Amino acid sequence: MQTQIRLSRDSSIRTYGMRASAIPYRTEIERSLSSGESVVIDFAGNDVTQSFVDELIGALILKEGRQVVSRLAFENCTNDVKGIIKFVVHDRV
């Protein structure tokens, strides 16, 4: 089974920048992963900072190990977002 996490819950937010704003999403991801599901993170219409992605994905890698990345998929990422995700994954793996 697969869970989809959409970052665009609040239309007033275009850029997710603070680490604290990633925690509720990471908690939701952790809950899905612990249930044996894979997770698709949908970045549609949103920009993110490295701090946000590190708290969202980097913290998961530190906690669960590098294999957690194989259970995550990313959708609707701009080139900038893709670059940030790649940097964080390589930094934490």
Label each residue range with its predicted role.
Residues 1-8:
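Short beta-strand/loop segment at the start of cytosolic alpha/beta domains
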